[in-house]
Amino acid sequence: MLEMTALQAAGLWSGLLILVLVVLSVRVVMTRRRQRVILGDGGDEVMIVSARRFGNAAEYTPVAIGALILLALIGWQSWIIHLIGATFLLGRVIHPLGLAFGKGPPPARVVGMTLTWLPLLVAAGLLIVCPLVGMAPG
């Protein structure tokens, strides 16, 4: 991987996460056309799932982007930003696949959410605990 600063790494992962949101949004539009649902979900199960794929990503992604940027700004090394960003991105790619296989927690959905929550928890821990105990980033 190219050598980059922590802020550049945060920018890289933020850009990739934004692309995931765009892809999921386009899929919602395509589903709307296919299912002939103009507004809302129309009670259509396919439309509901498509909208939730996007909605779930839209709920978590801004938090992750903010955390990546804050970690970079306070001085964490780029490898930590890459690790958190890559893990979160992997979770955001896997999770919608799990929603494709009906109700209940299929393995892809569980793995996707685990890979979403884990980097968010690590980021939260670094942002909260380190300043409280005087631990320097890096």
What are these regions (language model features)?
Residues 56-68, 120-121:
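Core segments of transmembrane alpha-helices
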Residues 125-138:
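Juxtamembrane boundary at the C-terminal end of a transmembrane helix
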Residues 94-121:
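Interfacial loop-to-transmembrane junctions
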Residues 7-35:
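N-terminal signal-anchor transmembrane alpha helix
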Residues 26-51:
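Cytosolic, membrane-interface loops and tails of multi-pass inner-membrane proteins
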